[in-house]
């Protein structure tokens, strides 16, 4: 006979707010842009609810001189014009134009190896900061001034702590020097775009704290972004927050997160751990997070086909995986501009986070039941307007056998104590969302 479960009390206080959410989204490869990709884009936008798109056009940062044989002459304006009018670049411009039409300003990024003549004799370490910055600024300048695209922010470097093939090697001490040159060259072009940095592989504050020691960069840095493919400790989160604190207006994003399983045989496990990691980020003050990857595809930077995508890529179709449905439990309902609120849970095996719109007429709870047994939740909402307390919550759930299924509508106020709040039964090992729908 199934277990009856235990009662778990959850208290949400509308008067105690934390960070504002910038959004959730995906890393996306624009080389795949073609008409048959449109159904996948529509899924990401209209069903998943992704609003952040970290878009890489070339896959490598050596686009002026892939073979490294031309040298500095490869940055000649005529040559760069030809590259930016070429097929690969045009796929990027068209994907961004499509996103702009859908109300999205993408996060333009660059990753992978740079031209070899920009490197030290070791063939790994970036040393020609001036020409590297010239190359990066030319990309942003073309996108904004020649293509007329709206771009939210720009990320010039990727995982410089591990280097090739993810990007050139740059020490934490040298990183701010590159940013100062980029800032100068962007300013000379009249480009007031925020930078996203440092996008490091290792989760620590080593590079962030050195960037934040340069007050001249405070107006240029819009986001401090980190990467996550494993569980992160509270001490690590504390370190990153402390490192970023001198730049209070720079938000924290997880520029890449997911799991590195490539077997394709652990999809429910991957969906589960990705959700727990996302909750960790949000509990620790992150304003946004982007899954690696939007869909299964070939990546130029490491020259491999990968299956990290939320969507499985088929011959003529893109199919949502379990990790897509788990992500949807958060992405679709917690919208940009929502604030995280205090949510206290009486048992540690149930995790719950609460979010509300600025006027608090929309409220969302997301969580997981980490127990293998069902739990009876009673959720009390304190300090919300009457339009909420007299309304109902839609209950959505993802489990090993469910895919963000709509389970029920539940009144915000119950009949009597101890069932006076939102009264919901959550099975073991499941992800749940309660979304106010009037």
Labelled PLM ranges:
Residues 11-15, 47-217:
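Substrate-binding cleft and catalytic face of glycoside hydrolase catalytic domains
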Residues 20-28, 49-59, 105-110, 152-156, ...:
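Structural recognition of the beta-strand scaffold that forms the well-ordered cores
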Residues 251-329, 341-348:
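Aromatic/acidic polysaccharide-binding cleft in carbohydrate-active enzymes
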Residues 346-386, 429:
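Carbohydrate-binding surface patches
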Residues 382-405:
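Solvent-exposed beta-hairpin/edge-strand motifs
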Residues 413-438:
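C-terminal beta-strand-rich structural cap/linker in extracellular carbohydrate-active enzymes
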